[in-house]
Amino acid sequence: MKRGGRDSDRNSSEEGTAEKSKKLRTTNEHSQTCDWGNLLQDIILQVFKYLPLLDRAHASQVCRNWNQVFHMPDLWRCFEFELNQPATSYLKATHPELIKQIIKRHSNHLQYVSFKVDSSKESAEAACDILSQLVNCSLKTLGLISTARPSFMDLPKSHFISALTVVFVNSKSLSSLKIDDTPVDDPSLKVLVANNSDTLKLLKMSSCPHVSPAGILCVADQCHGLRELALNYHLLSDELLLALSSEKHVRLEHLRIDVVSENPGQTHFHTIQKSSWDAFIRHSPKVNLVMYFFLYEEEFDPFFRYEIPATHLYFGRSVSKDVLGRVGMTCPRLVELVVCANGLRPLDEELIRIAERCKNLSAIGLGECEVSCSAFVEFVKMCGGRLSQLSIMEEVLIPDQKYSLEQIHWEVSKHLGRVWFPDMMPTW
């Protein structure tokens, strides 16, 4: 009996020990699976890439391992500085302490940088202050964006140029530069070309009054890899188009031209020779030529007098029937047409002519214009299903003997191959 009792006690003891070992093993396994701090840094890095900066900063406080990942160079290649003054903007600004940390610890990691500034001069000055400190980084892209009026233009030109030149000198592989509405000038463009001519592919510099045609020509002559360019019409010249058409230059993919007049009758618009356009389109047959017009009616005389390779036309002010008629005759490559206003004379003949001659037209928008319902249906019928975007206010369409406003939506839908309704003006 005693021996049997001892065996029973031994078995009970062994079972208890096994149970404790099992619980301990389970606890250890559970603690290992739940120890987020031991995750591989590569895994944490991939997760951090999908988090907004603020969430990433909070997560970096979990443990030392996560904090190390937070400061890895891969997370600081791309950054957007938002510089706003509380009195002039409702948008959140990048915290000053974060800016200090970026300059101190990550300036040499930055490659893709943009600055968004509000309308205040202080924000533009802050952007220049940051730019002037980027002496240890080689940027690949830089964008200076004014979210309201162009506040960079309020700065002394020398102050802005000094800050921008720091980036041009230290960046040896700049491929994209967006500096619309800034006081950049010809000498600073020469610095850009001297240091980045082999890598520059995109340059946006609309509304840069201190740049001359010679300044932009210098860029075109040296930056043979340039594929996208945006500038004002006063910088466009026959020499520039020929430089962009040289054998050394790659084929241009996108050329945007802003044709702007602030005061009627005070701006002279020169004429580009047809031979220059012909050479340009032979060299870059697939280029998108985008033109924005903000002119008064009497200033359109130099334009649309012969065939040009425009693909996208936007008229921001009232444009006459005569000009739109010339568009139909001179823009066979037209893909998109937007007319904000025309007046009270119906555009029936002009639309029909555009449909006949512009075989690639796929998008059209009409604002304060007038078109008879019959002419509009005929226009849609001629263009057919290729009209992927058709934005017409209901007030534009004038009922006639053939179609009422109720009937037109069915007829247009039939020719488009999809349901279509005219746009409605909000009641508020």
From Swiss-Prot:
Keyword Cytoplasm in record: yes
Tissue-specificity statement: Widely expressed.
Domain of life: Eukaryota
Pathway in which this enzyme or protein is active: Protein modification; protein ubiquitination
Compartment(s) where it occurs, according to its Swiss-Prot or TrEMBL record: Nucleus; Cytoplasm
GO molecular function: ubiquitin-protein transferase activity
SUPFAM superfamilies: F-box domain (SSF81383), RNI-like (SSF52047)
LRR repeats: 119-146, 181-207, 208-233, 234-259, 316-341, 343-368, 369-394
GO cellular component, one term: SCF ubiquitin ligase complex
Post-translational modification: Undergoes autophagy-mediated degradation in the liver in a time-dependent manner.
Gene Ontology biological process: entrainment of circadian clock by photoperiod; protein destabilization; protein ubiquitination; regulation of circadian rhythm; rhythmic process; SCF-dependent proteasomal ubiquitin-dependent protein catabolic process
Region (Disordered): 1-27
Signal peptide: none
Biased composition (Basic and acidic residues): 1-21
Keywords in alphabetical order: Biological rhythms, Cytoplasm, Disease variant, Dwarfism, Intellectual disability, Leucine-rich repeat, Nucleus, Repeat, Ubl conjugation pathway
InterPro entries registered for this protein in UniProt: F-box-like_dom_sf, F-box_dom, LRR_dom_sf
Ribonucleoprotein found in the keyword field: no
Ranges for domain F-box: 34-81
Disease: Intellectual developmental disorder with short stature, facial anomalies, and speech defects: An autosomal recessive disorder characterized by global developmental delay, mildly to severely impaired intellectual development, delayed or slurred speech, and short stature. Dysmorphic features included a large bulbous nose and variable microretrognathia. Some patients show joint hyperlaxity and dislocations.
Subunit organization: Part of the SCF (SKP1-CUL1-F-box) E3 ubiquitin-protein ligase complex SCF(FBXL3) composed of CUL1, SKP1, RBX1 and FBXL3. Interacts with CRY1 and CRY2 (phosphorylated). Interacts with HDAC3. Interacts with KDM8.
Job of this protein: Substrate-recognition component of the SCF(FBXL3) E3 ubiquitin ligase complex involved in circadian rhythm function. Plays a key role in the maintenance of both the speed and the robustness of the circadian clock oscillation. The SCF(FBXL3) complex mainly acts in the nucleus and mediates ubiquitination and subsequent degradation of CRY1 and CRY2. Activity of the SCF(FBXL3) complex is counteracted by the SCF(FBXL21) complex.
Cross-referenced PANTHER family: ES1 PROTEIN HOMOLOG, MITOCHONDRIAL (PTHR10224), F-BOX AND LEUCINE RICH REPEAT PROTEIN 3 (PTHR10224:SF18)
UniProt protein name: F-box/LRR-repeat protein 3
UniProt source species: Homo sapiens
